[in-house]
Amino acid sequence: PIGCADCHDAETMNLTITRPALIEAYERMGKDITQASHQEMRSLVCAQCHVEYYFDKNIEEGSQYLVFPWDNGFTAEEMEKYYDDIEFSDWTHALSRAPMIKAQHPGYETYLTGIHANRGVSCADCHMPYISEGGQKFTNHKMTSPLEYVSSSCQVCHREETEELIQSIYRNQDRVMETRLILERLLVRAHVEAKTAWDLGATEEQMEEILVGIRHAQWRWDYAVAAHGASFHSPLEISRLMGTAIAIAQETRLNLSRVLSELGLNEEVPYPDISTKEKAQEFIGLPMEQMHEEKEEFLKTVVPRWEEIAAEREAAWDVDVNMGSE
């Protein structure tokens, strides 16, 4: 669970950074995070977790060291170059054999490319707006969608009616989703066509550029999709990113068609029926029965132990659990 000490100094209650990965990422970029303004800190405390990251197994022996891949910059392309330069991949795709990167949740990075960040608006301004109670003004620590309290988040700056503000956000989401669905169809076809090429005897040399294209196109898709709220935070950047992914995916499929032709296939690649989740799982060979059993075992054994440890820890806290209750 997230507590006060994750974001606040225990003595002064000033905002503070407690995650080494964020401090180290700033240092590698030649920046001193201790010089950040209070307004910047109202977003940086969020950036301790709501970011893209990976675990480096080579920094400390026997451990997976948390790293933010910002050495080249905050954009998807700059992080892609970082991963390419160190030849990092999270997994190899079972169909295409492409070395894939799994985006985490680059919320802070996509926020930086949006209009609100450009205007100096922080994460807390919208997600933790000021409220008053008992004659005191303080930030709302119910961190959720600003649409739950439009009057104290959006309408501090915007004068439109509540419903119009909400609908404008939904319209952006719908438009981004249109592009996302087009890209997803192209990515699936690229993976299937790559598998067909391998099955027909394609060589590593023939597939090298193709696998890079699949990797880059899907990274952009995953980056856009995993950045929860990105269609609001930065709709133009997310649309641009998926547009470049569509171009890369199509160019990759064009290269694939040439390879397939060289291998003797001059017709459309047979496409599987993946119209349902179950059919897609079956096509890629997921052992769903085994996975369901493993999840049930996890819920029966691991989760109760977590809850037990949490209860033991909280029982030792010297606090009045009824403080503030009516």
PLM regions: where:
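Primarily the internal scaffold of c-type cytochrome electron-transfer domains
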Residues: 1-125, 129-302
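Extended, compositionally biased alpha-helical segments that mediate assembly or anchoring
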Residues: 311-326
